[in-house]
Structure formats: structure tokens, C-alpha cells
């Protein structure tokens, strides 16, 4: 399976963990600014989640700021993208 995100007219292949982290973020009841625990996003390490938050910021999907080693503040979430899985078989 291939995990993808389409933003505007650009499609980017992402990892399964990146897909799962973004899906978990989309499930958050978001009203800016929302404080989020790294461990609430699929059980990945804070470093791994932070890695993907940086990618999603560069992609224009969200904006965030770190608070400490366990939480971050979700400042903006652009829902103008499509997250999808394709089967390569």
C-alpha cells in the first residue's frame, strides 16, 4: 500500500506512520490554539511525531509550536488537502 497526501495539484507519498499521525490530528476537536500530547497521536515517539509535524508544516497542512517534550500547540490546520491510500497490487 502507498500512503499519499494531495495538496493543491501536488501529490506526495508519505509513510504509514505519517499517514496515521495526520489522521489522528484530523480527529482532534480543533479550535486554535489546541494543546496536543505527542503520545496521543498513535503511540509514536515525540521525536517521530515532531519529524512529521515539520513535514506537514512545510507541506502547508498545519502550523504548530512546541511547548515541551510531551506536548505541542496546534495553531492552524488547513483542511484543504486529501489524505488517501492506494493499493499497489
Cite the ranges covered by each PLM segment:
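Short amphipathic alpha-helical interface segments
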Residues: 12-40
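N-terminal leader/targeting signatures
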Residues: 34, 52, 77-80
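Short amphipathic alpha-helical interaction segments
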Residues: 43-58
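A short, conserved structural fragment
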Residues: 57-67
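Surface-exposed polar/charged interaction patches
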Residues: 28-31, 59, 87
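Charge-rich, solvent-exposed alpha-helical interaction surfaces
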Residues: 21-24, 52, 84
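Long, low-complexity, charged/polar intrinsically disordered regions in eukaryotic proteins
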Residues: 1-11
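Short, cationic-aromatic polyanion-contact patches
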Residues: 9-18, 67-89
Amino acid at each position: 500500500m502507498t500512503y499519499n497526501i494531495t495538496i493543491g495539484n501536488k501529490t506526495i507519498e508519505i509513510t504509514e506512520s505519517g499517514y496515521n499521525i495526520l489522521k489522528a490530528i484530523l480527529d482532534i476537536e480543533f479550535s486554535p490554539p489546541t494543546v496536543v500530547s505527542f503520545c496521543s497521536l498513535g503511540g509514536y515517539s515525540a521525536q517521530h511525531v515532531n519529524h512529521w509535524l515539520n513535514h506537514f508544516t512545510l507541506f502547508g497542512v498545519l502550523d504548530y509550536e512546541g511547548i515541551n517534550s510531551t506536548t505541542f500547540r496546534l495553531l492552524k490546520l488547513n483542511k484543504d488537502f486529501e489524505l488517501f491510500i492506494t493499493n499497489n497490487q
